[in-house]
Amino acid sequence: MKIIKVKDQVEGGKEALKVFKEALDSGVKVFGLATGSTPETTYDELVKSDIDFSNSISVNLDEYVGLKPEDEQSYAYFMKEHLFNAKPFAKSFLPNGMAEDADQECERYDKLLEEYHVGLQLLGIGRNGHIGFNEPGSSFDGKTHKVALTQSTINANSRFFDNEEDVPKYAYSMGIGTIMKSDTILLEAFGKNKAEAVKAMIEGPVTPEVPASVLQNHPDVVVIIDEEAASLLK
């Protein structure tokens, strides 16, 4: 695990840009992407840069169940606003939040992920150690699945919605087993509220109770953290 400590999230975005450029230069074709406030500065830096994804493919970690792609709170909309409109990929894939059959949708996405092997996977980490929507207790062998969001995750996501009642209660998420197949994983964490999760991920035992701790078993992980997120590390 390579740990890069930065002053703040803006500097973190600049470091992440270097990782993306190195991946492209080394021939990576498929990029696994994440959403939320953590990768926003990374996408800002990608948009400002001369990086070209026109021959690349993107696959996203997750999507809310029940939100149309044009819904402003959907992850499909987020990706367009923050990255795809300015830096289009040859192909971009997300789970379909409006799929009628959840099992079929998970199967479809897994087949897609087998076809497009992820060279670089971008991750954030939840306060409870989740990666994607793989909450504590998730199987380390998991594939794409429909997951009921924990109350802590619903609370954390409620800031993006007018009312907490509007926050979706389910999401489709890439499984931990699938995430671990990525050649390289880039995890970002910023802010004091991520410090406990970061400590558990890096220094704690590998346990399903801290899903991100499984990254200790991956051969090529880059962690970008700011001073606050790193504050509890030895």
UniProtKB/Swiss-Prot annotation:
Ranges annotated as spanning the membrane: none
GO molecular function term, any single one: glucosamine-6-phosphate deaminase activity
Top-level taxonomic group: Bacteria
EC code(s) of this entry: 3.5.99.6
GO CC, any one term: cytoplasm
Matches recorded under PROSITE patterns: GLC_GALNAC_ISOMERASE
Annotated Pfam families: Glucosamine_iso
InterPro entries, per the entry: Glc/Gal-6P_isomerase, Glucosamine6P_isomerase, Glucosamine6P_isomerase_CS, NagB/RpiA_transferase-like
HAMAP family tied to this protein: GlcN6P_deamin (MF_01241)
Function of the protein: Catalyzes the reversible isomerization-deamination of glucosamine 6-phosphate (GlcN6P) to form fructose 6-phosphate (Fru6P) and ammonium ion.
Protein name, UniProt field: Glucosamine-6-phosphate deaminase
Organism: Ligilactobacillus salivarius (strain UCC118)
